[in-house]
């Protein structure tokens, strides 16, 4: 299955000129397909997604400056459930994302890197191979950056130079035990896949449209409602349908969760 479902690497840097963040504050706008979008008072629209082997929901957040990383920092042995982090941050919605220490099912510490409001709260980019940063810079543009092999000092310099505001890490790894991947769409170019690109699993992904709106997608799988889950191909198709210029996988499996109050 792994050999039948692979993907080519994506090395292009994001072209920020393709994103022009809208200053429109209306709760009703027209999307890329000419359809009227109705946002709630928080500037959020929820969409239900149905695929061949998954069901999902997407949050479309009109103002990308409202999307931030929430964590349990300062780090400890035990983490929190997503709804606790969302409520603690005074937010109305959230999804999971990024790598964390899963041994013992305690989830108190991240893996790789974490940036919150411009501050690096976890800095170990060389602890795992194949790491990517997924986050937003201070201009509220989605960033998907290969940080494989960076030292902690290199990463600190990169965060300062690139103006990274909030970010987590996920991993590119194709093996018998893992089928992890990160870039899905870069500069309107979809990742080239062999087969479906990956197996089917619950997934969490992020994208950004040309108008700056953020797309947060979570799908089910692993037998939930009889669904196997979403493949890399599925994620790309959904993100393209909803106008993503750039998109990346954030996490998957039993961690995939969405909260929306």
Describe the function of each predicted region.
Residues 94, 206, 251:
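Short, conserved catalytic/metal-binding motifs centered on acidic residues
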Residues 1-145:
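Zymogen propeptides
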Residues 101-196:
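Active-site-adjacent helix-turn-beta-strand microarchitecture at beta-sheet edges
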Residues 72-78, 148-152, 219-223:
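Short, solvent-exposed aromatic-acidic interface loops
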Residues 62-65, 135-141, 186-187, 208-212, ...:
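Short acidic-glycine loop/turn motifs at beta-strand connectors
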């Amino acid at each position: 299955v792994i050999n039948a479902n692979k993907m080519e690497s994506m090395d292009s840097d994001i072209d920020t000129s393709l994103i022009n963040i809208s200053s429109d504050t209306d709760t009703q706008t027209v999307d890329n397909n000419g359809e009227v979008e109705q946002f709630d008072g928080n500037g959020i629209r929820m969409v239900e997604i149905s695929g061949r082997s998954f069901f999902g929901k997407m949050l479309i957040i009109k103002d990308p400056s409202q999307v931030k990383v929430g964590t349990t920092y300062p780090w400890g042995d035990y983490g929190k459930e997503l709804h606790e982090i969302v409520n603690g941050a005074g937010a109305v919605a959230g999804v999971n994302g990024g790598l964390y220490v899963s041994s013992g099912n305690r989830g108190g510490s991240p893996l790789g890197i974490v940036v919150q409001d411009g501050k690096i709260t976890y800095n170990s980019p060389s602890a795992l191979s194949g790491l990517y940063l997924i986050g937003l810079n201070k201009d509220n543009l989605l960033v998907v950056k290969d940080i494989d092999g960076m030292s902690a000092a290199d990463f600190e310099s990169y965060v300062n130079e690139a103006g990274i505001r909030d970010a987590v890490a996920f991993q590119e790894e194709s093996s018998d035990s893992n089928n992890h991947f990160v870039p899905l769409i870069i500069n309107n170019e979809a990742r080239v896949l062999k087969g479906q690109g990956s197996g089917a699993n619950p997934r969490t992904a992020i994208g950004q449209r040309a108008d700056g709106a953020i797309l947060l997608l979570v799908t089910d799988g692993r037998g939930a409602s009889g669904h196997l889950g979403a493949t890399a191909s599925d994620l790309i198709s959904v993100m393209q349908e909803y106008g993503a210029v750039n998109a990346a996988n954030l996490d998957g499996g039993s961690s995939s969760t969405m909260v929306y109050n």
